[in-house]
Design a protein with these regions (language model features):
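Divalent metal-cofactor coordination and adjacent catalytic microenvironments
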Residues: 1-159
Length: 159
């Protein structure tokens, strides 16, 4: 279940990358990413303070856009042969004499999205940094920071 919808994406986050048709896919995937980052806290303790809930929704929107652009980079970086024998993908160079077209393997593009498209570690780092921008010091409904990954200090303290 996505933690936000296209209406919020357009009017609360003011996003313009996703369309109404594509937004359910990317908002749902972004919500899944946030569930992993927050250790599932959002599923049982979604913030009840409105300002905190808005931050979660904005995080979902920002992550959804990042996932969308990563997907665009993945598609663009791979030259694919179509059924008619033609190739589609990112063009690296074109020569006119004897007609030569070279397709990029994606390494020429140095954007964070291109890096994330070719590396799971880079994608995890990008999504994590986006989440941290929005969720730092935001508590869940039980008062636990959404990004808190530690144990119970009182339970482990020595006397």
């Amino acid at each position: 279940m996505a933690y936000t919808d296209f209406a919020f994406y357009g009017s609360g986050y003011f996003g313009d990358t996703l369309t109404e048709e594509t937004s359910p896919k990317w908002l749902e995937r972004a919500s899944d990413e946030l569930d992993a980052i927050t250790f599932g806290r959002l599923t049982f303790a979604f913030p009840t303070v409105e300002a905190h809930a808005v931050k979660v929704k904005k995080a979902v929107c920002a992550i959804a856009e990042a996932l969308y652009w990563i997907d665009v980079q993945r598609r663009a970086s791979s030259a694919q042969k179509a059924e008619d024998g033609s190739y589609h993908g990112a063009v690296a160079s074109i020569s006119s004499g004897r007609e030569s077209i070279s397709y990029s393997a994606g390494s020429a593009n140095s954007s964070v999205y291109a890096a994330a498209a070719t590396s799971a570690e880079a994608q995890t780092n990008l999504i994590g940094s986006i989440a941290a921008q929005y969720l730092a010091n935001i508590p869940d409904a039980n008062g636990v920071n959404l990004l808190y990954a530690g144990g119970c200090w009182a339970c482990t303290a020595t006397q």
